[in-house]
A protein has these predicted regions:
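Auxiliary Fe-S-binding modules of radical SAM enzymes
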Residues: 46-155
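Conserved AdoMet/S-adenosylmethionine-binding subsite of the radical SAM
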Residues: 1-82
Length: 155
């Protein structure tokens, strides 16, 4: 979620230190990826998703943002599982806001969980569930247009 109320009531924490930590990490050159567990009815409104996307873009449009489906577990057994349509909507909002690397997780969605070149649109890393296939010869470089793809590429 992107409100102090959500962080306090659902996470038992405060939002401000999380945001400050992200700002510090990005400012000092640490590679950062962010995962948000989307809880339907808690932190999945268009306004909240848009606010989160704008904050991340303000740090860098290249920060990968993983929008992850939730399911009933542990202390939230009454939680409704995050619908695929909710993830797809959040993904679209994040892309509209200018984030270049947005992914959905905890669902099977090859298109929205794979990595594409933000310049030419070429598929670079295909993800099918837990299977990952790199489709480039030089990690971090699009073979279609030569665009550098930010990240920590170890294969």
């Amino acid at each position: 979620g992107f409100t102090e109320k959500f962080y306090r009531e659902v996470c038992g924490a405060r939002l401000k230190p999380v945001l400050e930590s992200l700002e510090h990490l990005v400012a000092t050159g640490v590679w950062v990826e962010v995962t948000t567990l989307l809880l339907e009815g808690y932190n999945d409104s268009d306004e909240e998703v848009r606010a989160m996307a704008r904050f991340l873009k303000g740090l860098s449009p290249d920060i990968p943002w993983h929008l992850t489906a939730a399911h009933p577990d542990y202390r939230m057994l009454d939680l409704r599982p995050t619908r695929h349509a909710t993830l797809a909507r959040a993904h679209a909002i994040a892309k509209e806001e200018g984030l270049r690397f947005v992914y959905v997780g905890n669902v099977l969605d090859e298109e929205r969980s794979s990595t594409y070149c933000p310049d030419c649109g070429r598929l670079l890393v295909r993800r099918r569930g837990y299977r990952v296939e790199a489709l480039w010869e030089a990690p971090g470089v699009c073979p279609g247009c030569g665009q550098r793809i930010p990240g920590v590429w170890t294969w």
